[in-house]
């Protein structure tokens, strides 16, 4: 099952938590869920160039708090905060409630699965060779502390007549290990030959404590590296200095 299921959904309540955090009765639940989907779709399409990793939605009493994790927060905020005020007003109109916006910077986009997938998709749309784009992403992730990464690209790669799937993997990606901190992201590249799908799995180390917020807390602290990867980087630097 670990090979088939979404790795984030598989670990919910263990070391991952939900992106929508609110409670509602049966009468309101469907409406609020569709509001969340609508807001996420709007933010991802409106701020495509800002490198959106994820959108977390919380609903305190009769209010809405939206946290946007972005690789380029400056593009969202705009000059003197003008753009973020416009975005806040649009989201308030969608929810018919007071909306608060928080922008969180993703310090290492090279080890964020969603941003890696989006980057590869943009390169494929610019006609960059898919193998080169995948290899470059793998090397960048491993260099910046990932313990393992796997990337698959599916579709009419390189304009081939028959669609196929190509993949690269480096390091460990233990999908069955529930304590493993595995980030997963997808993206679609709209090429001249059709749509290509990209999937990315990134293994960032193990989380030993049973804490649904552990993965998010690690990301917020900018500690995307696990202890094993830090030791490996230290040994690599020591060997380079001795050479």
Swiss-Prot record:
GO terms for molecular function: mRNA binding; rRNA binding; structural constituent of ribosome. PROSITE patterns: KH_TYPE_2, RIBOSOMAL_S3. Residues 229-243 have a biased composition (Basic and acidic residues). One of its GO terms (cellular component) is cytosolic small ribosomal subunit. Residues 39-107 form the KH type-2 domain. Keywords: Ribonucleoprotein, Ribosomal protein, RNA-binding, rRNA-binding. This is Small ribosomal subunit protein uS3. It comes from Rhizobium leguminosarum bv. trifolii (strain WSM2304).
């Amino acid at each position: 099952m670990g090979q088939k299921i979404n790795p984030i959904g598989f670990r919910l309540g263990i070391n991952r938590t939900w992106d929508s955090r609110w409670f509602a009765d049966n009468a309101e639940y469907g409406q609020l869920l569709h509001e969340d989907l609508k807001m996420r779709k709007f933010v991802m399409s409106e701020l495509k160039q800002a490198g959106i990793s994820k959108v977390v939605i919380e609903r305190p009493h009769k209010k809405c708090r939206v946290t946007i994790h972005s690789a380029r927060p400056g593009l969202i905020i705009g000059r003197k905060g003008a753009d973020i005020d416009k975005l806040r007003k649009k989201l308030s109109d969608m929810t018919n409630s007071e909306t608060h916006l928080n922008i969180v910077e993703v310090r290492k986009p090279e080890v964020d699965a969603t941003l890696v997938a989006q980057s590869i998709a943009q390169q494929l749309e610019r006609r960059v060779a898919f193998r080169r784009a995948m290899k470059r992403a793998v090397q960048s992730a491993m260099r910046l502390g990932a313990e393992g990464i796997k990337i698959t690209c599916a579709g009419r790669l390189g304009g081939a007549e028959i669609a196929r799937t190509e993949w690269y993997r480096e390091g460990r990606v233990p999908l069955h290990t529930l304590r493993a901190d595995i980030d997963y992201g997808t993206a679609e590249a709209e090429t001249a030959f059709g749509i290509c799908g990209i999937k990315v799995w990134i293994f960032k180390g193990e989380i030993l404590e049973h804490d649904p917020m552990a993965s998010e807390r690690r990301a917020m602290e900018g500690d995307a590296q696990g202890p094993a990867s830090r030791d490996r980087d230290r040994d690599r630097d020591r060997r380079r200095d001795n050479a």
